[in-house]
Amino acid sequence: VKFDPQPAAARAAGIFVGVLCGAAAAFGWAAGFVAAKHGISIGFSPADLAFDRFFWTGLLLMPVAFRDGISNPGGIGWWRGLVMSVLAGPPQAMIAYSGFILVPLGHGTTIQPACATLFGLILATVVLRERATAMRVLGGATIIAGLIVFGAESLATIGHSGVGGDLLFVTAGLFWASFGTLLRYFRLSGTRATTVVAVLSVLVYTP
């Protein structure tokens, strides 16, 4: 029987692209955190930063979102779009940015992505019915251990306000994980969903 290497090659290429996209997203996320912390330190409020983050993008993408008509923005509908806008739009952003008022930059850049991953693992098992492999369980346990260390450090060095800041990042991570889970559950295009989030953020949040 002749062995066809194409499936293995295709899987390897897919893994490579996935890792590359993940690394690029992590870099972009980290850069965004640094910019947000700097903005907070020079006097911008979380609401100001959320406005600046979504307003210009929303204006630019508005023709794309409504090219199929105003009744079906981005092809995903109003109610799905509004839910996505809560989970990945200004509410999520303001929760995350508020955390930087209370705790150092390192807490946000670690806790929010870690919680997004942890809650993503949980939601994938509960909502998407994906199998909880031993590696996933081990990874989740490692994340929990790290979060406990961060929480203890906040309580010891910053006090209750530090724990409050950490919990804001935990909440922001939960929102982001829920957004990703719903993308999979509804089989939505990430590009379409992001476009609708930006546009509805302009229409609902900006006024």
What do the PLM-derived regions correspond to, one by one?
Residues 2-48, 145, 155-185, 203-204:
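Glycine-/small-residue-enriched transmembrane alpha-helix faces in small-molecule transporters
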Residues 18-23, 76-85, 132-144, 166, ...:
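Cytoplasmic-side transmembrane-helix entry/capping segments in multi-pass membrane proteins
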Residues 26, 51-52, 93, 107-115, ...:
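Helix-helix packing/entry segments at the starts of transmembrane helices
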Residues 28-33, 65-112, 121, 149:
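Specific transmembrane alpha-helical segments of multi-pass solute transporters/efflux pumps
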Residues 48-59, 88, 97-131, 172:
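Specific alpha-helical transmembrane segments that line the substrate/conduction pathway
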Residues 61, 135-154, 198, 202-205:
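Hydrophobic transmembrane alpha-helices of multi-pass small-molecule transport proteins
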Residues 61-72, 119-132, 177-188:
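C-terminal ends of transmembrane helices
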Residues 110-113, 129-149, 159-166:
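Loop-to-transmembrane alpha-helix entry segments
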